[in-house]
UniProtKB/Swiss-Prot annotation:
One of its GO terms (cellular component) is cytoplasmic vesicle. Residues 393-442 are annotated as: Disordered. This is SH3 domain and tetratricopeptide repeat-containing protein 2. Keywords: Repeat, SH3 domain, TPR repeat. Residues 176-239, 267-330 form the SH3 domain. PROSITE patterns: SH3. One of its GO terms (biological process) is myelination in peripheral nervous system. The gene is Sh3tc2. TPR repeats lie at residues 529-562, 758-791, 837-870, 1002-1038, 1085-1119, 1120-1153, 1167-1200, 1211-1245. The keyword Repeat applies.
Amino acid sequence: MGGCFCIPGERSLPWGPGKEGSSKDPPGLAEDTSSLENKRKCFLPQNMTQDLVLSFCVKSRSRRCVNAALQEAARRRLWALENEAQEVHALFKDLSARLVSVQSQKDQFLITFKTLEEIWKFSTYLNLGYVSICLEHLFFDHTYWLNSRLVDDTEIQVSVDDNHLENIYLGLLLQEGHFFCRAVCSVAQPADKEGEYLTLCKNELISVLSGGESECEAMSLVTGQRGLVPMSALEPLPVPFHQWFLKNHPGICGLPRKRDWTGSGQIGRGRCKALMDYEQEERDELCFLQGESIDVIGFVIPGLQWFIGKSVSSGEVGFVPTRSIDLDSCSPMSKNSAFFSDEERSSLWSPGSERKAECSGFLCSLAHTDITSIYRLSEFEAIQNLQNDLSASQPEGFREARSGGTWMERQTIGSRRSSGSGDSSPEEDELISASSDSYHLPEPEDLDDPELFMDLSTSLEEDDVEHFAPILAFLDHEGYTDHFKSLYDFSFSFLTSSFYSFSEEDELVAYLETSRKWAKMSHMTWAHARLCFLLGRLSIRKTKLSQARVYFEEAIRVLDGAFEDLSLVAALYINLAAIYLRQRLRHKGPTLLEKAGALLACLPDHEFSTKNELDVVTYVLRQGIVVGSGLLEARSCFLAIRLLLSLGRHEEVVPFAERLQLLSGHPPASEATATMLSSLYDKKYLPHLAVASVQKRGPQSARGMSLSIWQAYLVLQNATKILGVPSSNWCEVSALACPTLRQALAACEELSDQDIQRTLCLILSKMYLQHQSPDGSVHYLSQAHVLGKLLGEEEAFESSLCLAWAYLLGRQTEKALEILEPLLCSLRETECVTQRGVVHNLLGLAFEDEGRTSRAAKSYLRALIRAREMGNIRNQAVSMANLGHLTLKSCMQQSARGYLLQAVRLYSELQASKETDMELVQVLLWLGQASVSGHQLVHSRLCYEMALLFGLRHQHLSSQLQVTKSLCHFYSSVSPNPDACITYHEHWLALAQQLRDREMEGQLLESLGQLYRNLNTSRSLRRSLACIKESLRIFVDLGERDKAAEAWLGAGRLHYLMQEDELVELYLQEAIQTALRSEEPSLALKLYEEAGDVFFNGTRHRHRAVEYYRAGAVPLARRMKALRTELRIFNKLTELQISLEGYEKALEFATLAARLSVLTGDQKQELVAFHRLATVYFSLNMYEMAEDCYLKTLSLCPPWLQSPKEALYYAKVYCRLGRLTFYQLKDAHDATEYFLLALAAAVLMGDEELQNTIKNRLDSICQSPLWHSNPFGCSSERARWLSGGSLAL
């Protein structure tokens, strides 16, 4: 959380070396304020929006341009999430931002912040690069993560308006009221208001306590003085971490206003040159001359006033003022370890042997396969391979373990064992608890052989020096030895290892106090000092801080500047400084505070002795912020991290770790912190950040197998949290872990760890198989196969079977046979019955895939025999099921049912487990299919419903999906049952929602809408409309405009059926507009026609169909030259106008339809068009034209009648012509001829009723006056344009 913003950046605001604001300046500001106008505008609140735009761009690293395909994929994914943004909300919650809206078309998010902490954390994640990686988690699916080249080549660049972000930050600062600033110029006190105003130097750090518009009350963090300061002279600290730290760890530094360090911008070590002569002011300081060489003990850090040096000429050791030496003459720290030594860096993240073993065990559990002992079921992967399985077994060793625990917990040795003092204050408790760790008193036989071993049960005479000689001799050693380590360690183990048999701590204190007196009397300097130190630590245990201070001060006086035991000197100075800080006694030892800070920060591998050292660490960090030294700030953050980890206060580590990560910049320094952050994020349940912090490190940072395996372990755990899979499910491998697993594999290859290499290859192959990518699986299994041969026969056999199985799943049967057949030959002379059975079974699957049914059956039978020999019921069941499936594919339903029923019986004998129940689901599906083929519908339904029950029992989504599909087909096509069909479609929809398959969900809602519509009740139409509208929303989210357009149309059709006419046009128009926007003319044409059909096929407002047909569909059809579509539309228009009695319009449309029918060359279409045209002419009383068109239709019929339907058509048309010519054209003789032809057609049909009707009609004509008016039987002459062969219309 130690972030800064992009534009404000890491501004180091140095004070000019030795330059103060002149006292001669006029009162008020010591420099012209016109240059500060922009800063004041930024600082004072302005009218601005609190929303921030976060834009993203998916780029290719190699091409250095936008990856258009991935950018579009991200946009589509975002579009799908725009209306259901729970997943996006959850992501930005992890990133400490509040999502306002998703703007997919603009490739951006709108976010906001309510607190300083939120904007601080978000800016940190933004600068660390975690935001862009988290967006990858959101945008891309497994196809991206499994493509290693694409992942390595892709980066998401995110951008924000940094000025706007800074303004939001400043606004929130002003809301809080209490914040920290730097003086942008020197400020002097006005002469007439002396004492009221604060005198400031440029860049001095100020704590603003309360403010007005022009002035504010403030306190200097350098001097501690309070007073008024002009607001225009202040600039808020731009780094949120600084604001947080100074607010939560208040205090002043007591530094001089002049900066005491210049020169190098790096931490120095090695040897340096003195710039001036220096005479010691205190005994612990080093005297030297200008130009003298000084060896740096530890580091020299810019920003600290002191460091520890050793004179090359005299060999003396002491404190050296930083200002007196040339920093550039030191050897700078390398970029690889800019702020700490290699040993210190390794202490931050080293997983250790225990963690490596635990992670390796987990990976082995994940890679475990039973392929060497359990037969494989044909086509079983269709049910198994689904990532969103809701219930699965968990590998051993993963139930209780947490990914970051061991290496952190290792640093908490003894930190939680506190012995409470009942009457101590909370503040004192915090200071004391680390030093007052409770300890047990071991018996002598429990102890190793210590250098000092004192029995305090015997009575000791204070006057007898002999009783105290052992401890005095032990402690009076000049300088440091390993025996003294227990004096300074965190657990104070010296007490428990060197003394025993005392009932109360007071006895121990009395013994040590007497020993101190003897040491003092005997002038035993080192024993005296160490005893004072021990008594001081014991005084802290008893909350006697003042007494402890006296002991520590006495010890320092006794040492009189001796540095032979640096651990003792550091412990004394730091403990005493902590007490000064806690008791607010800075004035008592200002120099000691600075020297204690130097001992703490400059000595590498410092071992913390007490919890109260945190006060000194924060003092040094505050000093680094005040003087603007990023190096000192980074070193202090590192020390804070180590101490807090030692105390087990992991929550408090995060801000310091994030700040250190921002300051580190270069690997491997940043890698150590990044690894630690990964574990901390995991502990805080921030899975996106935990994975991002690992992935951010990249493939180049996979150094060391233990670390790489631990990272893979952590990512695998957190990837399931990102996907929302319950923590109990570890049998699936998320594709999100693929890059990390590959890095781990590369690290193992460098170290030639073949066992772990093979394990990782098996896990990667499993991942690729889960995502239906057999080629990727084969790649890694080929490596595992080679490694298996090197490891042993068992591993080689297992790897061979896995590879063959992958080839079978990838339909590479020949390659599978190349492995399996030699493998079978090698097993013939062995007694490995089960293994031979496994190979026979896989051979059967291979032969079945090739269509070699006979050989497949023989292999399955041999596998069955081997299973029976071993008494393995499960393998027998699988063999029977495979035989049943083989015979089912060969259309031998009876045999198939027999085998499958035996398989079901065998499965019923097994103890219930998820694996066997899922196999049984597949067998029941086959048995149901066989029953359908045998027309045993009741049995089939029973099989399907039993299979679904097993899927529900184990919450196994894939099996439920397969069974539900079969049930939907069964109740829609095999044994129609609308209610049952709807029920199972609803369940299918629920499964799609659990699988987060939006496309499937949309299609199912569309199908459900149709099913409800078919019921045609008021309630079902309402439900249908709800389904269609929900599918519409999904299709719009997915950007599938064609389906969205059809959904708009479907909703409009339903509103028409529900007589909600005011909404019909709205939905139909939106459907057409959506289709037009898709730039697919064929879709627009289809929807124009279907929109017209809504009215054409209805009973209300049928005239509205004309505008969709004539104005919409016809122009599009002509533009696309879709003759048949245009013809169909004109036919509909003709029929519509006839029904509406608009015969003039009908004639226009029918004529056009007839012309188009001629152009199509389809005689059937031409016949229909001319028949409809004849009907229009008849309706318009144009009888001669009607007769001609009817005759044209007859000419289009085949010369020989081929079916009763054709004969019926002839009979009807000739009857129509007969009535027309007799009644309308008054031509009895032509009418007679037409009726005779109709009679002939009726005779061919064998329809006696029709024949009698026609004969009666002929009799009436012959007896009519019209017949007798023309006795010669001559017909009248009439035009025959069309029937005579003319093409003109």
